Amino acid sequence: MSETSEDEQTQLQTSDEEEDLGSEEEQEDEDNNHKEGDSEAALSGEDDKGSEDDAAEEQKLTWKDLGLNEALCQACDELKWKAPSKIQREAIPVALQGKDVIGLAETGSGKTGAFALPILHALLENPQRYFALVLTPTRELAFQIGEQFEALGSGIGIKCCVVVGGMDMVAQGLQLAKKPHIIIATPGRLVDHLENMKGFNLKAIKYLVMDEADRILNMDFEVELDKILKVLPRERRTFLFSATMTKKVKKLQRASLKDPVKVEVSNKYQTVEQLQQSYLFIPVKYKDVYLVHILNELAGNSFMIFCSTCNNTVKTALMLRALGLAAIPLHGQMSQNKRLAALNKFKAKNRSILISTDVASRGLDIPHVDVVVNFDIPTHSKDYIHRVGRTARAGRSGKAITLVSQYDIELYQRIEHLLGKQLTLYKCEEDEVMALQERVAEAQRTAKLELKDLEDTRGGHKRGGDTHDDSENFTGARKRMKPMGGTGGGGRKSFGKKNWSKGKQKR
C-alpha cells in the first residue's frame, strides 16, 4: 500500500518548474489546443451532416445496447433518460470492460451518468461496502452527484454518503460508520475523516472517480489528493472526468491511472450549438443600469448572473431586490445550509434570478436556466466556458450575455480567441437604458444602506465564517422602496416604461 502511494505522490509532485509557469503557460496551452481543435475539425470534416449522424446514432442506441444491467436500464427509463448522451455512449462500454477512463466533454453532457452507471453495474455484480469513492471540487456538486447515485440505485438499495465541509463532522462520521456503498466527498473534508476517524479507511475501494478534475487541482487540493492516493489500493479502476485537459490534469493522469482510454466527444473549448452568445460594451459606471435593462427586456426567463466576488453578489442582489426582483445570491462565504437553500429555491423556480460567484459555474445541474449574464467578466477565459455552460443544457436553447467595460477589453478578446469566433453585439437602445438610471441609482443607495445594516448586525458572525443570509432577510430594502412591476416571488412580469415612470413619482 505505501509503495503504491509513494509512486503516485512522486509523480504528482514532480516538475515544479512546470507548475510555476503561470498564466503565460496556460495561455499558450489555450492557443495550441485551439489550433489543434481547428485542424482536427477540418481533417475530420465535422459539419451539419456529422451532427445529423450523431443524432441518428443517439436515437438508435439504447441503454441496454451499452451492456448495462436490466435494473439500471429500467432506472434510466424511470428518470426519463431517453437515450445515452455522446459521452455516455463512448465512456460506458469502455468502463464496463474494466479499463481506466479519461472523459473530456462539454458541461451539461451527462458526465455523471457516464461514471455512475458503470460503477453501479459493477456493484450489482460484486456487492460490497466502501465500493466507490467520488471526489469533487465543490459541496454543491457533491450533493448533486449523491442525488443521482441514489436516484439510479433506488431500486437496488444503494447507500450513499456525502462528505463535505461546512457540515457536522460527527454526523458524517456516523454515516461513514454505516459503511455506505458510495462515498462522494470534497478532498479536504475526506482527509479530515481519514486522519481523525478511528477505524475509517479506504482499503476496500474498487473505483475512484475524480470529477471536474481540473477544478480540483485549480483549487489547490494537490496535498489532499496526495494523502488520499496514499491510502487507496493499487488494484482499482480510476475514472477522471474533466471539461478541460490542463498540464496539471495530465500529471494527475500519470500519477493515478493505468493505461487509460481517452474519451473526448467535443473540442476542448467548444460551446453547445444551441447557445446564443453575445456581448454588450458599456461604461463601467452604468453597469447596474444595463443589467436591469437586460432583465427587463428578457423578463419571464430564469437568469444566472455571475459576479467576481462574494461582496458583489450580495450588493447586486440587494439592488435588484430593492427593485422588487426575485434575486437570490450564492457564494462561498455562505454556510452550506444557506447555499443549498439558495440553490433549491432557484431550482424549484421560487426565485428567477441566481447571482453567483464561480462556485456555481461548474458541474451543477440546474436545467431551467434560460439566460446567463457575465456581470463581471471572468479573469480566466476558460471559466467563461463553464459559466455559459449553465444554460443551453440537454438540447435546450439558451442565451449568454457578457458585459464588457472599458477595463475588460483584453479579457474579452482572450475569450473570443479561445472560442475562435467573434460574439454578436447585443442590441439595445441607449435612451431606453438611461431612462432607468434614476431608479437604479435609488436602488443602489438603498442596497448600500441594507448592506451596511447587515454588516453591522452580523459583524461578529461574519468573522466566524457565516456571512449574510443573502436570501430571505433582505427585507429592509423592500420596506423602503416599492417593488417595481409586480414581479412578486417569481419575477416573471416585465416592469416596463410605465412602471419606471411611476417609480419616479414622489412618495
From Swiss-Prot:
Its EC number is 3.6.4.13. One of its GO terms (molecular function) is RNA helicase activity. PROSITE patterns: DEAD_ATP_HELICASE, HELICASE_ATP_BIND_1, HELICASE_CTER, Q_MOTIF. It comes from the Eukaryota. Residues 494-507 have a biased composition (Basic residues). Residues 1-31 have a biased composition (Acidic residues). Residues 92-263 form the Helicase ATP-binding domain. Residues 426-453 form a coiled coil. Residues 1-58, 451-507 are annotated as: Disordered. It is found in: Nucleus, Nucleolus. It is an enzyme of class 3 (hydrolase). A motif (Q motif) lies at residues 61-89. GO terms for cellular component: nucleolus; nucleus. Pfam families: DEAD, Helicase_C. Keywords: ATP-binding, Coiled coil, Helicase, Hydrolase, Nucleotide-binding, Nucleus, Ribosome biogenesis, RNA-binding. Belongs to the DEAD box helicase family. DDX47/RRP3 subfamily. Part of a translational control module, also containing ath/DHX33 and ais/DDX52, which coordinates germline stem cell differentiation with ribosome biogenesis during oogenesis. This module allows for coregulation of ribosomal proteins and non1/GTPBP4, a p53 repressor, preventing p53 stabilization, cell cycle arrest and loss of stem cell differentiation. With atos, adjusts transcription and translation of a subset of OXPHOS genes in macrophages to increase mitochondrial bioenergetics and allow tissue invasion. This is ATP-dependent RNA helicase DDX47. It comes from Drosophila melanogaster. The lineage of its organism: Eukaryota, Metazoa, Ecdysozoa, Arthropoda, Hexapoda. The gene is pths.
